[in-house]
Amino acid sequence: MNNYHRGHFAEFLARVYLTLRGYHFVCRNFVTGRGTTAGEVDLIMRRGRTLVFVEIKQRQTLELAAYAIADKQKQRIMRGAQSFLQKYPQYAGFDVRFDAVLIKLPFAVRHIQNAWTM
């Protein structure tokens, strides 16, 4: 399996994992802007009145996956979240959270709630 297919499988696995834990799918691969103003979110889920912006990382170990989320990437995700909330005002009153789902294939998954804050 090449990196492209591993990435798509990891996104699918994260979505199923969160759905089985009571989260509802909102959007995947939300992208806005270009260059330094770009925003990007792998997965957006909802649980109650909380909108969860999820970064998914798949590596050979869960520890390597955790270290792979750089500060620049967190900034892009936060810009993506701000853009999403502006584009979809029906979520304006929701609480916002940034989570990470770490994956070691074939099936080791770790969900980190509140992985970072704005």
Regions found by a protein language model. Give the residues of each.
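Catalytic cores of nucleic-acid endonucleases
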Residues: 12, 33, 58-106
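Glycine-rich, flexible loop/turn motifs
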Residues: 26, 65, 108, 112
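Active-site metal-binding core of divalent-cation-utilizing nuclease and nuclease-like domains
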Residues: 24-51
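Conserved catalytic cores of phosphodiester-cleaving nucleases, focusing on short active-site segments
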Residues: 41-64, 77
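Acidic-basic catalytic patches of nuclease active cores, encompassing PD-(D/E)XK
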Residues: 1-30
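Short, low-complexity, polybasic intrinsically disordered segments
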Residues: 104-118
